[in-house]
Design a protein with these regions (language model features):
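C-terminal peripheral helix-coil segments that are non-catalytic and often amphipathic
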Residues: 1, 130-141, 164-209
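Short, basic, alpha-helical segments at the C-terminal edge of helix-turn-helix-like DNA-binding modules
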Residues: 65-71
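Outer-membrane beta-barrel translocator/channel fold
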Residues: 154-162
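Hydrophobic alpha-helical connector segments
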Residues: 62, 73-104, 141, 148, ...
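Amphipathic alpha-helical packing segments from all-alpha helical-bundle domains
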Residues: 71-76, 116-141, 146-153
C-alpha cells in the first residue's frame, strides 16, 4: 500500500521511507529495498529519498538501525517480564528468532555483508550492546553479568544462523526444525535460574543481618 501525502516533514519522510523499506524487506527480501522501490511505495521521488539517505546503502543502514532499535526494545521488555516470572523464556527466544527470520533481519545482514556494506550493521550491533549493558547493570554479581553476555551472544548467533540455514541443517541431521530454538531456550532457562538463585541467596543473607 502506497502512502501519499503532499507534504511531509523531513522526519516524517524518513520514517515513512524506513517503514516502507521494512515492509519491502519482509515481502520481497533485501534486494528489493531500493530507493526507487521505496519512493514508489510512499509517493515520493528517487531524488527525494536520495536527499534523505544519500544512497541505497544509506537507506539500508537506516533500516538496520530501525530494526535494531525495535527488536532490542521488544526483547528487553520481554526479558524484564521473564525475570519477574510473567512470561516464559521461550517467548524471548521466539521473538529473537522471528526477528531474524520472518522479520528479515537475518537476510538483511547477509545481504549487507555480501555487498560489502558491513558498516550498515553497526547500528544493530550497537543496539544489542546497549541492551546488554542495561541488563548487565542490573545483574546481582559480575558472574551473572558474564552469563548475560554469553547468552546474548549465543542467542543472536543462533538466531542469525537459523535464519540462513536452520531448515536444511536440521533436516540433514534428522532433527526437528525447532531444535535450535529448543537449545537456546534451555540455555536461557539456566541463566534465569542462576539469576533467581543469586537473588534468593542475597535476600537470605540480608534477612540474617
Amino acid at each position: 500500500m502506497s502512502i501519499k501525502r503532499s507534504r511531509l516533514s523531513p522526519d516524517e519522510s524518513r520514517h515513512a521511507a524506513v517503514e516502507a523499506a521494512r515492509i519491502l524487506l519482509i515481502e520481497a527480501g533485501p534486494q528489493a529495498v531500493t530507493l526507487k522501490a521505496v519512493a514508489g511505495r510512499i509517493g515520493r521521488t528517487h531524488a527525494n529519498l536520495l536527499h534523505h539517505f544519500g544512497s541505497a546503502a544509506g537507506l539500508q543502514k537506516a533500516l538496520a538501525a530501525h530494526l535494531g532499535d525495535t527488536i532490542t526494545a521488544t526483547i528487553g521488555e520481554a526479558v524484564d517480564a521473564a525475570r519477574r516470572g510473567e512470561v516464559a523464556p521461550r517467548l524471548i527466544v521466539d521473538m529473537t528468532f522471528d526477528a531474524f527470520d520472518a522479520g528479515g533481519a537475518g537476510a538483511l545482514a547477509s545481504w549487507m555483508l555480501a555487498s560489502g556494506n558491513e558498516d550498515a550493521l553497526d547500528p544493530v550491533v550497537e543496539a544489542i550492546h546497549r541492551l546488554v549493558d542495561k541488563l548487565v547493570a542490573t545483574a546481582l554479581t559480575p558472574d551473572l553479568g558474564d552469563v548475560i553476555r554469553d547468552n546474548t551472544l549465543m542467542l543472536v548467533l543462533l538466531a542469525l544462523g537459523d535464519s540462513q540455514m536452520g531448515g536444511p541443517m536440521a533436516s540433514s541431521l534428522g532433527l526437528p526444525r525447532e531444535k535450535a530454538r529448543e537449545i537456546a531456550t534451555r540455555s536461557l532457562i539456566a541463566a534465569l535460574m542462576a539469576e533467581a538463585a543469586a537473588f534468593a541467596a542475597t535476600k537470605a543473607a540480608q534477612a540474617k543481618v
